[in-house]
Regions:
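General structural signal for secondary-structure boundaries
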Residues: 13, 55, 166-167, 199
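Acidic/histidine-rich catalytic neighborhood of metal-dependent amide-processing enzymes
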Residues: 110, 116-198
Length: 199
């Protein structure tokens, strides 16, 4: 699935954004224990630390059995914002017209397992926050980036993170969780254009 939406403001960075998502896809972060390979998860974590140095320099990183929590201090510690999107994926199924793990970029589209569900949104979160930090932006409130490594199998990393936040008195003002793609053509069973925001 893809969208033809463009914003000229971001065109100069489009190659970087596509490269980021492509590299995300190349990491076979399959959480199903039958196909699980820890080295692929380690590769993903190593990449984001190199790719987004300011996020990790300015943020406090905690590992929850592969689950990612990064807290970036804002001017206020009250009413933080949480941005969420998981980075694990399911095994490739069915027939693919290309390698599901290639992260192939062609005609402005990045192909592969996880592009929509949901490495695309996670890449957007990291790229946006890194860009803001690079510009010297100061967040009004604390920001948490949270990403599950076990969402597809209903794992314990996010429940553990929720408990950690609760135990430390953190009460988010807003949680934006993955949502879905902005896709054109529409998903099966939906007439017209389609977008979903998870809040």
């Amino acid at each position: 699935m893809m969208s033809e939406y463009t914003d000229e403001k971001f065109v100069p960075e489009k190659n970087r954004y596509a490269e980021t998502l492509s590299e995300f896809i190349k990491c076979k972060t399959i959480s199903d224990e039958r196909f699980f390979d820890k080295t692929e998860f380690d590769k993903f974590l190593s990449f984001i630390k190199r790719r987004f140095p300011l996020v990790f320099e300015k943020g406090e990183y905690k590992d929850f059995n592969g689950g990612i929590m990064i807290k970036i201090d804002g001017k206020s510690h009250d009413e933080p914002l949480v941005l969420m999107s998981h980075y694990d994926v399911v095994q490739e199924n069915g027939k693919w017209s290309f390698d599901a793990w290639s992260g192939k970029v062609e005609n402005g589209v990045v192909y592969g397992r996880g592009a929509v569900d949901t490495k695309g949104s996670l890449a957007a979160i990291f790229e946006s926050v890194e860009s803001l930090l690079n510009e010297g932006f100061a967040f009004s409130n604390d920001l948490y980036i949270i990403s599950s490594s076990r969402e597809e199998i209903a794992g314990t990393d996010v429940p553990d993170m929720v408990k950690y936040l609760a135990d430390n008195g953190v009460k988010p003002k807003l949680v934006i969780d993955e949502g879905g793609g902005i896709v054109d053509p529409p998903v099966p069973g939906v007439s017209g254009k389609y977008a979903m925001i998870g809040m």
